[in-house]
C-alpha cells in the first residue's frame, strides 16, 4: 500500500513519505522594487524566477513508499522531476468529465515513477530489480495478496504503450505479462484472490480506428427537463459531452475487455467488452461485481452519473444476477446530504466468501424531508436467489463498513448539515443483536477524534479490521489533535468495554505517525518520523521497554546547504473571541530585534464550522519538517520574506445560522487579527504585507482586497470570483442561488471589483476542469479590475488544469509571483508605490 500523510484515512499502512522542499537563504537579502511589469503581450513566453526559486523546483524529490501486506518489505518508487510542457501539452480528449490520453488510452494526467527498488523493513537493506523496462514509467503499483509479486503499469506516451509488468519479489526480476491496457478509469488491473492471477482491462482486439467527425453537424444537441421532477441541483461540471460525435468517441475509448491474466502471462477473456466503471472479484474469487455504463448519455453530468447496470457475473463473465439498473442522475435535491435513490456504494463484504453490501436512501435522497431512517444498509449473499436482508437502518448517510468477521464490523454514518459522525459496532452474522454506539462526535471537533481503525490485508487481498492476537481488541491510529498541537498516536481498544489503551504517542522534538503494528516478539510498530530539519523517514520501533527506534530509510534534506528556517506555531484571537492558529516562518538568520520587521506573505484557505469552539482548536504541529515546495508560499523565504502559512480563517455558523451568512465579516476579522499579530511580534511591516491563495484561497484573496486595505498586494491562483456562475452551491454552501441570493452576491468579489485598490495578480490554468473554477472566472475578474482602473495582471497557463504540472508553468508561476511581490512589497515602508 502506498504511504502518504494521513487525512481521514482508514488504512494504517498507507502513507507516502513525500517530504517537501525546504529552501533557506542568507540572513538578509535586499528587496528592491522592480520595474512595473508591462501589459500582457503576445509571445512573452515562459519565464524563469530567480536562481533560489529555481532550486526549489529542481531539488530532488523524496521517493514514495509502498508497504507490503506483511509489513516486512517496502517498494520504493523514485518520482522524477516535473514533466515538460511538451509532455503536458500532448493531445488529450475531454469527454464526460474525463481527460483521456488517446495514444495510451489512459488518464491523461497521470504521474509516474522513474526508478523502482525493494527495501527491507527489518534492517533497511535495499535490493535492486533486474529486467525493468527502460525508460521506466510506473503509473500504478500494487502488491499481490501473498506478497510474492509487485504489479505495475508501464506507460509510454511516445509509443502509446500501456503495459502490465510483474516483479518476482524473491528473484528480484521484472517481466511484461500484458499489453494494450485501458486505464482511463482506475489502474486497468487488479489482483484476484490468492495472487496467482490478475483481472486486466484491455482494449478490445480488432477495435479499429476511432470514429472521425466529418465536420458536418448531424443535428442540434438537445437537452430537456422531466415534467414534475422538482428542484434538482446540478453542479457546474466541465469537459462534458457536447454532441453525438463526442458520444461516439467516448464509447470508443471507454470500451474495455476484461481478461484474466495469470502470473505466467496466459490470458483468458472474461465476459464481454463494455464501458466498465467497476469490476471486482468476490473474496472467494467465484463472482465478479460489474458496473457498466449504458446509453442514454448526458451533456450535463459526468460519466459517474450516467445510467448503469449493476450485475453479478460468474468467474467466466456470465450473468448470474442483476442487482439494479440505475437511471441517469442529472440532478439531486438541494443540500450536501442529498444522494441518488436506489443502490448506492455497493461493494463486496470483505470477510465473507461472496456477499454484497450497499445502501439505499429511505428519504428519497432528499435531506429536507422529515425521516427517522435516512439510509438502509442491505446485505445479499451468494447465490443471490433470495431478497437482501437489512444490516442496519441509519438516521443519517451510510459512510462505509470496516469488516473483521461475522461477530464484528464497524459501521459508519455521517450527516453533513450537523457534521455529526457516528460509528457502530455490529455483528453482521447476528442481525438480531443490537448495535453498540462506539463514536458520536462532530467531525469538526478534532480533539475528540478517536482515530481510524487499523486495517490489515488478508489472504484474499481484502482490507479488514486488524484484531489483537487474543481477538479481544482492535487498534486505532489518530492525529492526536490537542491544545499542544498534533501528537499522533496508536491505541488498543478493548471490544468488551470500549476502553482505549495508549500503545504509542509521538514525542517532541519529532512528529511521528504510526503506520502499522505487529504483535510477534513483544510487538513492533512502523512509523514515519520527521523533525523541523529532517524529512519524514520510515522507522521501526519495538514495543519492548527501553528499545531504541531503528531508522529504515535515511532521506536527507533535499537542499542540505539551505537550512535554518525558524517555525513557530502561533495562537491569537480575533475580535469575536475565536482563537486562531498559524505557522509563522522566519528566513534563515533573521533576527527581529536586530533586523527589524520584514515584508510578509500570508497564504490561507478558509474553512466552514458549525461551532466556534471547534473553529478555535489548534491544528498542525510545530515539529513537522519545514517542507517548502514550489506550490506553497514558503519558497519566498528565499527572498527574505516572513511567511505566515495557513492562518486559520474559520467561517462559523452555529445552530440554524449558516456560516456564509457572515462570510465577509468573519474573513475580514480573521485577516485583521493575523496582520495585527505579525506586527505585534515585530516581524511584519504593516505597510508591506501581501495575501495569497489557491482556489478557495484565491476567492478569499480577492474578497480581502475588495473589503480591506490590510494588504499591499494579492496573488489569486485558479479562483472563482462570481458566485452566480456556481448557482447550485460551492464549498460547504448547500443553498442554491435562488434560496440565498443576497449571500451569493455579497460573497462575490466580482461585485466589489471597484473597491479593489491594491494590486492583484491572477494566475489560472487554461484547461482548469475543477467544478466551479472555470478559467473565465479569472478572465472576467481581471477585466473588471482593469476596466475600473485597478492594478492587476492576468497570467493564463496553457494546458494546465486546476493544479499546474509542467516545469515551465511552475517556473512562470513563481517568476510572476516573485516579480509581483518584489514590485509591491520590495519598496521601503512608506515609499509611494
Predicted regions and their residues:
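Short hydrophobic segments within beta-strands
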Residues: 585, 603-604, 692, 763
